[in-house]
From Swiss-Prot:
Its EC number is 5.4.2.7. Pathway: Carbohydrate degradation; 2-deoxy-D-ribose 1-phosphate degradation; D-glyceraldehyde 3-phosphate and acetaldehyde from 2-deoxy-alpha-D-ribose 1-phosphate: step 1/2. This is Phosphopentomutase. The gene is deoB. Belongs to the phosphopentomutase family. Isomerase that catalyzes the conversion of deoxy-ribose 1-phosphate (dRib-1-P) and ribose 1-phosphate (Rib-1-P) to deoxy-ribose 5-phosphate (dRib-5-P) and ribose 5-phosphate (Rib-5-P), respectively. Binds 2 manganese ions. SUPFAM superfamilies: Alkaline phosphatase-like, DeoB insert domain-like. It catalyses: 2-deoxy-alpha-D-ribose 1-phosphate = 2-deoxy-D-ribose 5-phosphate; alpha-D-ribose 1-phosphate = D-ribose 5-phosphate.
Length: 403
């Protein structure tokens, strides 16, 4: 009999809570990450009002300087701590894979200055189409088609771009480059990015339609990921016949491995919360685990170094938290965490190497307080412990602390 019949894990993408001990080994535009602090700097510079997360214990998480505008609760309703990453990376896939129990000792490659000429030339030779060199850098997916879509419509050239994560994305107007052709080109790109110096987590086909000034991306997106290099706790749950629900890009991050119910991509954080609540209130979801990623913090505000937008996005999630809690059953456990930092006040535009917050709440709790500081993979070890399956490579369960 599981202590918690259902467990729900929400990753607030990039919501770090202060520089990790090894942060100075990671850099942003030449500046070490040692002074990064996503939540701390948002709270200090633009104010942060998240009463529902504060009630669970967000302001109680141990820090050298308390969060300026998030007070500690004398009697929180949940358990709280912060967790440290052991893997050699600060990207989305590394963070999520470690949360699910893997230790990534060979990080994926990211391309802040765009992909090397060798890769672009191989794609050109395979496809018979030229690549627009000016788009070959980290780019917003909507901005890149606004900037280069008109040219693509005239020339048929490929729009290839990347992001802070280890991904290669190809945008193609469906009337100019048919979707099936785009998929073939992406499959070729996948075949040449499976090992270093270009080990990429995902190749993403990004079809779009419309006219200049009014382009829209279509639902024909396709992700060509790589599977985790070892079984994760998702795999262990799936093998044991336990329901696993994915909300947002979780299924992409794990290449579908270990997931038996995919609620689809999120159009926004609010849409993701809607999808999570839909899963939680489904008649079919009686026992098991849901895993949600809410990416707007990172994609819309962290990389763009927009602390006000990031703060507002946190406020928006906090306002929805009571709805999520209302969808819980008595023996459910809700866990809220992150996958890395992305301090919107920091140098550069990359992720930041930080501790992640961890909050846990159940209507069945008889107590509350702090859990000892641990590591990302402790989350999956706790999930495995609860459902009676093996943990993955690393992680120590804190299930016995949740009472």
């Amino acid at each position: 009999m599981s202590k918690f019949n259902r467990m729900h894990l929400i990753v607030l993408d990039s919501v770090g809570i202060g520089a990790a001990p090894d942060a100075n080994n990671f850099v942003n535009a030449g500046v070490p990450d040692g002074a990064s602090d996503t939540l701390g700097h948002i709270s200090k510079t633009v104010g942060l009002n998240v009463p529902n997360m504060a009630k669970l214990g967000l302001g109680n998480i141990p820090r050298e300087q308390p969060l300026k505008t998030v007070p500690a609760e004398s009697n929180p309703t949940g358990y709280a701590t912060k967790l440290e990453e052991v893997s050699l990376g600060k990207d989305t896939m590394t963070g999520h894979w470690e949360i699910m129990g893997l230790n990534i000792t060979e990080p994926f490659d990211t391309f802040w200055n765009g992909f090397p000429e060798e890769i672009l030339t191989q794609i050109e030779e395979f496809s018979g189409r030229k690549v627009i060199r000016e788009s070959n850098r980290p780019y917003s997916g909507t901005a890149v088609i606004d900037d280069f879509g008109p040219r693509q419509m005239e020339t048929g050239e490929l729009i290839i771009y990347t992001s802070a994560d280890p991904v290669l994305q190809i945008a193609a107007h469906e009337d100019i480059i048919p979707v099936e052709e785009l998929y073939r080109i992406c499959e070729f790109a996948r075949s040449i990015t499976l090992e270093r110096p270009a080990l990429l987590g995902r190749i993403i086909a990004r079809p779009y339609v419309g006219e200049p000034g009014n382009f829209t991306r279509t639902s024909n997106r396709r992700d060509l990921a790589i599977s985790p290099f070892a079984p994760t706790v998702l795999d262990k749950l799936n093998e044991a016949g336990i329901d696993t629900y994915s909300v947002g890009k979780i299924s992409d991050i794990f290449n579908g491995e270990g997931i038996n119910h995919d609620m689809g991509h999120n159009k926004s954080n609010n849409h993701g919360v809607d999808n999570l609540i839909k899963a939680m209130t489904s008649e079919d979801f009686k026992h098991g685990f849901s895993f949600t990623n809410l990416v707007d913090f990172d994609a819309l505000y962290g990389h763009r170094r927009n602390p006000q937008g990031y703060r507002d996005c946190l406020h928006e999630f906090d306002e929805r938290l009571p709805e999520i809690i209302a969808a819980m059953k008595e023996d459910d456990l809700l866990m809220i965490t992150a996958d890395h930092g992305n301090d919107p006040t920091y140098a550069g535009t990359d992720h930041t190497r930080e501790y992640i917050p961890f909050l846990a709440y159940s209507p069945s709790f008889k107590s509350s307080g702090l859990i000892p500081v641990g590591h990302f993979a402790d989350i999956s070890a706790t999930i495995a412990d609860n459902f009676g399956v093996e943990k993955a490579m690393i992680g120590e369960s804190f299930l016995d602390k949740l009472v």
